[in-house]
């Protein structure tokens, strides 16, 4: 569904309520709170579980 990642499955990688950010300098997702800045995320977005 998303770009190249190191994840081996398609389950949402974060806890409920958080969102997944793909840092510009990394291929693995990091988890952010919805209030965090997404300036360092691919496409400036943090993907919620609903949108995963």
UniProtKB/Swiss-Prot annotation:
Protein name per the record: Conotoxin Cal9.2d
Keyword check for Chloroplast: no
Function summary: Probable neurotoxin with unknown target. Possibly targets ion channels.
Compartment(s): Secreted
Predominant location category: secreted
Assigned GO CC terms: extracellular region
Cysteine pairings via disulfide bonds: 14-31, 19-41, 21-46
Expression by tissue: Expressed by the venom duct.
Organism domain of life: Eukaryota
UniProt remark on domains: The cysteine framework is IX (C-C-C-C-C-C).
UniProt keyword annotation of Secreted present: yes
Keywords on record: Disulfide bond, Ion channel impairing toxin, Neurotoxin, Secreted, Toxin
GO molecular function: ion channel regulator activity; toxin activity
Residue positions assigned to the propeptide: 1-6
